[in-house]
Amino acid sequence: MTYYELVITNIKIMSINNQLRELIKSGTFAGILLIIAFTLAIIVSNNIFLTKYYSSFIYSKFSLTIGNVRLQTTFIELVNDGLMTFFFLLIGLEMKFHLVEGEHKNKKKLILPAVAALGGVVVPVLIYMFFNYDKPRLIKGWAIPIATDTAFVLGILSFFSRHISLELRAFIIGFSLIDDAFALIILALFYTKTINTPALLISSVIIFILFILNYRQVKQLFYYIIVGLLLWISMVESGIQGTLCGAIIALFIPVNIKGEFNTSFKKLENLTSPFVNYFILPLFVFMNSGILLEYFAFKGTCSNSILALIYGIIFGLFVGKQLGIMLFSYPFVKFKLCNLPSDTSWLKFYSIAILGGIGFTLSLFIGSITFESSCPSNSMRAAVIIGSLISALFGVAVLKYCTGKE
């Protein structure tokens, strides 16, 4: 190889590396990983030779000992109830940063994302209840269609980055985070098992310790990690979803200390983000998306009543999300209580509302703690995937149409 060819080769390698970095930074890569994880789960769960290995992998049992506490669990439970804590930690960190230092420091700019998120919760719930109000076994799944998968939405929008203004991106992030906040509150209030009062009191004491750490403006992450681990154990023992402790910890880590930005806060967010987006979420999707293809044709449904569950989720995600976001947002903009993001038409805003119906990861998470028996669980997962897929395809089509005119 000549010197000239070597230089050209190095330039090409550097160009590829730069493109990969940009791909990872844009959020597209996280969305691609989720699609790959989902595809692999469908393939292995429907392959006669691989399905037994898949099942033995996700349901393999082992015990975890922390101090005097011994937890016996399966791998899928460890991911859903343990590792997903980091997902909620990241949500909490991003939420706090955007409120204190980010785009939504100006509270007026928070009005539109807040009302859009509220509409995106209320209407999907009403639609789900319309189909399942007379089915006591299925009505408890009402929170499944309220979620929006931020990683997927941002991944899709990265392909339209030239047409997405900074204000519109800020709206999308704000809407997604507030939507996640509603999901967290609903999980804490309505999806709690039998309460263990002594463990709940211990959790309260630990949360008070977090308050003291915040009040004293302690910035060392070590203390928050230790206290957070104790909080997770006590919350699991109390019957409350232990994963929620991630968001609680994030709320108590100070963003600013004595008027200066706390670099430890951003350091934790930077460490958590790739771990969550490139490992935990793909692993969660892989372990929770393995269902037989017959469920997508509704041939595997156990009874006609399960169809109500399926319709409630699909219509809740696809119709409920877009309808709720638009119905709640329009009056606020019309009466000048807030403004649409800059360079954003109502059609473009509508395309974002449709993409809000991509529930996927968080919808699967809520569904996994709602339905444990295989019949409703498999139908629930198929419905979440179908509803999210329809929302993604239709949202992209509308967004492509309106950006094509710009």
Swiss-Prot record:
One Pfam family hit: Na_H_antiport_1
Catalytic activity: Na(+)(in) + 2 H(+)(out) = Na(+)(out) + 2 H(+)(in)
Membrane topology: Multi-pass membrane protein
One Gene Ontology molecular-function label: sodium:proton antiporter activity
Membrane-spanning segments: 29-49, 75-95, 111-131, 141-161, 170-190, 195-215, 220-240, 242-262, 278-298, 306-326, 349-369, 382-402
GO biological process, any: regulation of pH
UniProt similarity note: Belongs to the NhaA Na(+)/H(+) (TC 2.A.33) antiporter family.
Free-text function comment from the UniProt entry: Na(+)/H(+) antiporter that extrudes sodium in exchange for external protons.
Protein name as annotated: Na(+)/H(+) antiporter NhaA
Lineage: Bacteria, Pseudomonadati, Pseudomonadota, Alphaproteobacteria, Rickettsiales
